[in-house]
Amino acid sequence: LACPLCKTRAMWENSPGEINLMFVRNAWYVAAWETEIGETPLARTILNEPVVMYRTADGVAALEDRCCHRALPLSMGKVVGDNLQCGYHGLQFDESGQCVKVPGQSKIPPGAEVRSYPVLQKYGWVWIWTGDPAKAEPDQIPDWWWLDSPEWRTIPGRGGTPMHLNANYLLVSDNLFDISHLTYVHATSIGADSIVDFPVKTERWEEEKRVKMSRVIYDRPAAPFYQKAGKFAGNVDRWIMTTSDLPCYMASDAGSVEVGTGVTPGEVGPERGVEMKIMNLPTPETETST
């Protein structure tokens, strides 16, 4: 079986003449839930790079998690105003990574700085950019309008805490993009033997670097989850659609309606059936963890 993601990923260049098949750096990644970042520094490894995040008066800052003085992780320090203070000798760094205070001396040594990362807050997540800062355009994050819509109720996964996996993020993406496994892995919830007879459709948009897998099932018994949620009297029409936006954004849309009432993803209200959208955003930690 060919993976439609692989061909498209190979075309994503980090910079002219460079193609990194392991990590795409010129892209936004979810670094944390907004609620995870408070008064204490938060350490994360993002694309093999140790990062520390902390909250400022204006938002969130992200710095290299290493003091330029003696290399102690800055996450072992504390937040002082809008600065991050190293826990070893008290050097303070502002959100740009520049050292702004050295205890015991008034002059800041040349080169006393650490790397800072572009960050933004959107859809309840903190996003980080580990590539060329000049290319960090906010509109590169897809428009997932339903996450801000009052007509949709958003339920944070795992209560708003990340899931750590000892697997490469491409394997995680492959699993999330594979809608053929539902019958067997999720037989007691959203899987059903009857769906395997309906074809899976693949669509690709090269310019947008987007791939979509979808399967529409007509006039079949409702899967256990949908039957419980929708209390359908008879068979249903249902759909399973997963859209992958590079580097690793996975947006799924799935639902069931009464037979013949119309499969219209994004437009199914509770009076017609059951619809849910599931966001999975696997962020690479290392080559072997996500």
Task: Please report, for each region that a protein language model flagged, where it lies by residue.
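Rieske [2Fe-2S] iron-sulfur-binding domain
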Residues: 4-13, 17-20, 30-152
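Detector for Asparagine
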Residues: 14, 20, 26, 48, ...
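Short Pro/Gly-enriched beta-strand edge/turn motifs at strand-loop
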Residues: 24-33, 96-104, 183-186, 260-265
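Short edge beta-strand segments in beta-sheet-rich domains
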Residues: 26, 114-116, 277
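C-terminal catalytic domain of Rieske-type non-heme iron oxygenases
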Residues: 137-290
